[in-house]
A protein has these predicted regions:
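Hinge/lid segment of periplasmic solute-binding proteins
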Residues: 126-171, 185-191
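N-terminal export signals
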Residues: 25-26, 32-56
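Mature extracytoplasmic/periplasmic domains
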Residues: 298, 303-362
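Conserved C-terminal helix/tail region of periplasmic/extracytoplasmic solute-binding proteins
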Residues: 9-12, 16, 257, 359-388
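Short beta-strand->loop
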Residues: 135-146, 166, 282-294, 303-306
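N-terminal secretory signal peptides
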Residues: 1-32, 55-57
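Ligand-binding pocket segment of bilobal, Venus flytrap-like solute-binding proteins
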Residues: 206-210, 214-218, 222-289
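Early extracytoplasmic/lumenal segment of secretory-pathway proteins
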Residues: 60-127
């Protein structure tokens, strides 16, 4: 399915593409293009994809410091974009990779991360606000942020108590990947995923080192809510996890290397990893369990402890530029809730069912709930599972 810009927006996706092509061919002036598309304030970051704007990007050079630090997820960025940002500004991008929101929360609470930008998931932002670990954003410093083009359901969690704390990065789903050359059956459910873990795929299965998804999808075996904190339901999920533990290859949120080497044949997975693996190794498929699971959206945000604010704002604004963001998507395969970006993506991506699942599959999914991030019972279940 292809996302379309609503009719009440100032420019449609089709019109945006028409104007972009006209501008690239030199048929219209720079002023005309920027005015018609509403990207006039974004010239500083558009220049990487449009050399005609290059002069304005150089204004950043030397003015934001020598580095910017981002905490993000595995396989979730385009290195060429980071290199371009360094080339344009002189600020080197330092990357910290984490595998769960619990890990990110713990590091921020401990202090001293040195992060300027981090990538929280939708359900965690209200907790960061409550704990005073995140700072509200000054929208005037993010000219590429334009709500008119954004899909509402994926951006709402970024606003808490009327203040904007985070701007959308990507959205996606949590399902599982499997190597169809190794697994001959055709699983379509979480029940089949966990049953295969203990039978035909024993010793070849990975689950996330992340309680939300690993516990959540164990809960789906029993058709409980992905977000359940009910003691009896969590006890059922814990028994399933501990019974499955001897049959696992690994507990790790970075599962691509093992899937590529065929050390693992099946793993809990996110949209973009599923697309990357399927693109490179067609026998690896991505499946959304029919019982449901997780729908999520990730954001760019600035920690309360950030010291390099000029670099943080410049970096976020660069990354949410439609052209830069499209380059991100083409590499990692996670959709963006920004219709300006979708308009720039190739048809083979906008019509790919891994990126844009069928409505009936999406309708069965749940957004993560804030309570799961700090619920002690879920934390205890995950700890006992990992130590079993």
């Amino acid at each position: 399915m292809t996302r379309k810009i609503p009719d009440d927006n100032p420019i449609s996706a089709k019109k945006f593409m028409e104007e972009l092509r006209r501008y690239e061919k030199g048929s219209v002036s720079r002023r005309h293009f920027l005015g018609v598309t509403g990207l006039g304030a974004a010239t500083a970051v558009m220049a990487g994809a449009m050399p005609m704007l290059a002069g304005s990007r150089k204004a950043f050079a030397g003015s934001i410091g020598d580095r910017v630090s981002i905490a993000t997820w595995p396989n979730y960025y385009n290195p060429e974009n980071f290199e371009q940002f360094t080339k344009d500004t002189g600020a080197k991008v330092q990357i910290s990779v984490f595998g769960s929101n619990e890990e990110m929360l713990a590091k921020l609470q401990a202090g001293g991360t040195g992060w300027d930008v981090f990538v929280p998931t939708n359900y965690t932002i209200s907790t960061y606000v409550e704990l005073d670990l995140i700072q509200p954003l000054d929208v005037s410093r993010l000219p590429n942020f334009n709500e008119k083009y954004l899909i509402k359901r994926f951006i709402e969690p970024g606003t808490v108590n009327g203040k904007l704390y985070a701007v959308p990065k990507n959205w996606g789903t949590t399902g599982f990947v499997l190597n169809r050359k190794k697994i001959k059956s055709n699983p379509t459910s979480w029940r089949e995923f966990w049953d295969l873990t203990k039978t035909d795929a024993s010793g070849r299965v990975m689950v996330h080192d992340y309680q939300l998804t690993t516990i959540g999808n164990a809960l789906k075996y029993f058709e409980y809510s992905f977000n359940s904190v009910d003691p009896k339901e969590l006890a059922d999920a814990e028994k399933l996890l501990i019974d499955s533990k001897p049959h696992l290859f690994a507990i790790n949120s970075d599962y691509q290397p093992s899937m590529r080497s065929t050390d693992a044949w099946m793993s809990i997975a996110w949209t973009g990893d599923g697309l990357q693996l399927n693109r490179d190794i067609p026998e690896i498929d991505y499946v959304l369990g029919k019982e449901g699971g997780e729908l999520w959206s990730d954001f760019y945000a600035i920690p309360k402890s950030a010291k390099r604010l000029d670099a943080a704002y410049a970096f976020i604004n660069f990354l949410i530029d439609p052209v830069v963001s499209a380059k991100e998507v083409e590499v990692h395969g996670y959709p963006v809730p920004d219709d300006r970006v979708t308009a720039l993506l190739p048809k083979e991506m906008t019509e790919n069912p891994i990126m844009y699942p069928a409505k009936e599959l999406l309708d069965a999914l749940e957004f993560g709930a804030a309570i799961t991030l700090t619920d002690p019972l879920r934390a205890e279940v995950m700890a006992r599972f990992k130590s079993a």
